[in-house]
Design a protein with these regions (language model features):
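One-carbon transfer enzymes
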Residues: 1-190
Length: 190
């Protein structure tokens, strides 16, 4: 069984959706929540779901040996970034080649890169009058939001949609597609 670590900086709704979706699955399960913020609500979600969690700050991530050891101690095979706002260290990408994925709240390459996360993305989408938005699930590479695309799903927008409306449409796509995509990646092909 593949053991997953989910990296989160905030609320953790995608973490919870993935954990619940994989519950009872024989191919993969969420074994660890890693948050860089001690006040992240995701830590409470992990406690409620019975998932072990660890606060691992930017300073902790700067220590390659300790970070790799922490993940090794938990037998982590795969990493999912779900609202994780730190840049993933290069050493981690090299240690987990094609085993780290991210979800981005836009149709990359639009609205990607440094500073483009959460409502920053949705505000830019609204400001530019986009007719659609969506999600991109991709492998993590050394280029911010530049890894190979696994899945893109779009949703139409109306000029009347507010930033909150856009965010809600994107959250619905995340909820529907992110857990299924994680399982699909980790399910052995026949």
């Amino acid at each position: 069984m593949k053991r997953i670590a989910v990296f989160v900086s905030g609320n953790g709704s995608n973490f919870e959706n993935i954990t619940r979706f994989l519950h009872g699955n024989y191919n993969a399960h969420v074994a660890l929540l890693v948050s860089n913020r001690p006040d992240a609500y995701a830590l409470q979600r992990a406690s409620r779901l019975g998932v072990e969690s660890v606060v691992w700050t930017k300073t902790d991530f700067a220590d390659e040996q300790r970070t790799i050891q922490m993940l090794t101690d938990h037998n982590i095979h795969f990493i999912v970034l779900a609202g994780f706002l730190l840049m993933v260290p290069t050493y981690l990408i090299r240690h987990f080649p094609n085993r780290i994925i991210n979800i981005h709240p836009s149709l990359l390459p639009k609205y990607g890169g440094k500073g483009m996360y959460g409502n920053h993305v949705h505000e830019a989408v609204k400001e530019n009058g986009e007719k659609e938005t969506g999600i991109t699930i991709h492998y993590v590479s050394e280029v911010c939001d530049g890894g190979e695309t696994i899945l893109q799903v779009s949703t139409p927008l109306s000029p009347l949609d507010s930033v909150d409306d856009i965010a809600e449409k994107v959250h619905q796509l995340e909820k529907e597609y992110f857990p299924k995509t994680v399982l699909e990646i980790l399910t052995p092909k026949k």
